[in-house]
Design a protein with these regions (language model features):
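Core catalytic ATP-binding domain of two-component histidine kinases
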Residues: 1-123
């Protein structure tokens, strides 16, 4: 587990409602794994990943206390083959974008003033 090996804590803030969403669960599982992996890599060591859900609006949000995202990087995040990682291929966020668009989700990835970078998915 990438989080355990880096001393990263996971905090769950899940809504009490249990909404039903029609999605390809295997694709969404991979989306969530990719987002959490990116968060862990951004944090490095000793940080926190927060997974939050809400029912109204129906939303999944994954936030992290990592290094954040500059405005320059934010503008390029979903560009093919763009990566901030030394050996990154720049296809992870492209895959995520394609899955979310296929499911008619809206999404954003940006830093917030509280120091947490959030990937927000609205269904």
């Amino acid at each position: 587990n990438v989080c355990q090996s880096r001393s990263i804590s996971l905090r769950l803030e899940l809504c009490e409602e249990n909404p039903v969403v029609s999605i390809d669960t295997s694709l969404f599982e991979q989306v969530i794994i990719n987002i959490i992996k990116n968060s862990a890599e951004s944090i490095g060591e000793n940080g926190e990943i927060i997974i939050r859900t809400s029912a109204s609006p129906l939303m999944l949000e994954i936030g992290d206390t990592g290094q954040g995202i500059s405005k320059e990087v934010e503008a390029k995040l979903f560009s093919p083959f763009f990566s901030t990682k030394p050996n990154g291929q720049g296809i992870g966020l492209i895959f995520i974008r394609e899955v979310l668009m296929k499911h008619d989700c809206t999404f954003s990835l940006r830093p917030y003033p509280d120091g947490i970078t959030r990937f927000r998915i609205c269904f």
